[in-house]
């Protein structure tokens, strides 16, 4: 059950961080205004709290593993929201990152 909770928290963190960064990008680069930037900053702040909810106690392990989730999530966000079409190297790289997440977070370790 901890693994499912952990995965759900990684998804939440990705939505908050990637979504927040996207909102800031839209506000600044696409000139959509301060409301977009403000919403992005709030989402990015909430992302910081999402990581603290992980069942794993080691900050470095959680953030290192989240980096792999961020890579895959960013490509997925770009495909769904911005119409970006990842190529086979994008997909392969994202899959490698997700395998790394699995190893870093969920490999059996001695107690």
Curated annotation (Swiss-Prot):
Spans through the membrane: 7-27, 33-53, 62-82, 88-108
Protein name, UniProt field: UPF0060 membrane protein Krad_3114
Pfam families linked to this entry: UPF0060 (PF02694)
Annotated localization: Cell membrane
Membrane topology of this protein: Multi-pass membrane protein
Family: Belongs to the UPF0060 family.
Alphabetized InterPro entries for the sequence: UPF0060
UniProt keyword Membrane, yes or no: yes
Leader sequence residues: none
Keyword Ribosomal protein applies: no
Location, primary (coarse class): membrane
Superkingdom of source: Bacteria
Source organism phylogeny: Bacteria, Bacillati, Actinomycetota, Actinomycetes, Kineosporiales
GO CC annotation: plasma membrane
Organism: Kineococcus radiotolerans (strain ATCC BAA-149 / DSM 14245 / SRS30216)
Annotated NCBIfam families: PRK02237.1
Keywords: Cell membrane, Membrane, Transmembrane, Transmembrane helix
